[in-house]
Curated annotation (Swiss-Prot):
Disulfide bonds, paired cysteine numbers: none
Domain of life: Bacteria
Species, as recorded: Thermoanaerobacter pseudethanolicus (strain ATCC 33223 / 39E)
Record's protein name: Nucleotide-binding protein Teth39_0666
UniProt-recorded Gene Ontology molecular function terms: ATP binding; GTP binding
Pfam families: PapZ_C, RapZ-like_N
SUPFAM superfamilies hit by this protein: P-loop containing nucleoside triphosphate hydrolases (SSF52540)
Keyword line: ATP-binding, GTP-binding, Nucleotide-binding
Length: 284
């Protein structure tokens, strides 16, 4: 489980950072109240469906400071790992950004932006000290900020501009509505009709060996991998940040799971950022 808190100075890019985290497969919530952090942590740390969470937090308010420290203490006591990313920028850049958007700084009571920035720096000094990562966005574009975050949260891999989400599914439960590419692997021999394989899934070695022993399975996987590699640069060129690839068989337990797993491993070796999940593996 990866639990990330994104905070920092107003105008430093928290919203853009959360968008980048979402593109990297994180479940994101903006403007999250610190007092609710313990309940959310309990929920997600016991969930099998979410393994990466990023929360945008505005910590300017007085009560929020007490809430954040007590909430972080709760996480520590319960051995919930978390990371804090603190975003900042120079006074000159922050002033320019506020003027361009014609927004008033939330802490500038008399209307002077620079006074609000100075006050906010003081209030956030303590949380900045305990941050795991501090990013100065003064000279960063949105794409460069995404690159910085990817260097931190994608295990050192270079972010190639797109997240590939591979999903297995069963046609009997419907085609995924969010799929960009759908591949039907029902042409492959079905392990369902092998009695000893029926209760297993494509995550089991016996099923994997059965599916992948056929030449058509090997050839399909090779051609599928080559095609995806060919397409990815063009999707990136069109500005796509996430590509959802759905692979289906009848029930979503055997063939589709095996092929989805194999495609996931292939693209990981190519150093792409890949997410894998099996939508219908628990259905009967």
């Amino acid at each position: 489980m990866r639990f990330v808190i994104i905070t920092g100075l107003s105008g430093a890019g928290k919203t853009q950072a959360l968008k980048a985290m979402e593109d990297m497969g994180f479940f994101c919530i903006d403007n999250f109240p610190p007092a609710l952090l313990p309940k959310l942590a309990d929920l997600f740390y016991h969930s099998k469906n979410v393994d990466k969470v990023a929360l945008g937090m505005d910590l300017r308010g007085g009560q929020f400071f007490e809430d954040i420290y007590s909430s972080l203490e709760f996480l520590k006591k319960n051995n919930y790992d978390y990371e804090i990313v603190f975003l900042e920028a120079s006074d000159e850049v922050l002033i320019k950004r506020f003027k361009e958007t014609r927004r008033k700084h939330p802490l500038s009571e008399e209307g002077r932006i620079v006074d609000g920035i100075n006050e906010e720096r003081k209030r956030l000094a303590e949380i900045r000290k305990i941050a795991n990562s501090i990013i100065d966005t003064s000279n960063l574009t949105s794409s460069q900020l995404k690159e910085e975050l990817s260097n931190i949260f994608l295990k050192g891999k270079k972010f190639k501009g797109i997240i590939i989400d591979i999903m297995s599914f069963g046609y009997k439960y419907g085609i995924p509505l969010d799929a960009d590419l759908v591949f039907d692997v029902r042409f492959l021999p079905n392990p369902f009709y092998i009695e000893e394989l029926r209760p297993l899934t494509g995550n089991d070695d016996k099923v994997k060996e059965y599916v992948m022993k056929w030449e058509e399975a090997k050839e399909f996987l090779k051609k599928l991998g080559d095609m995806i590699k060919f397409l990815i640069p063009y999707y990136i060129r069109e500005g796509k940040s996430q590509l959802v690839i759905a692979i289906g068989c009848t029930g979503g337990k055997h063939r589709s799971v095996t092929i989805a797993n194999a495609l996931y491993e292939f693209l990981k070796k190519e150093d792409y950022s890949v997410i894998l999940h099996h939508r219908d593996i628990g259905e009967e």
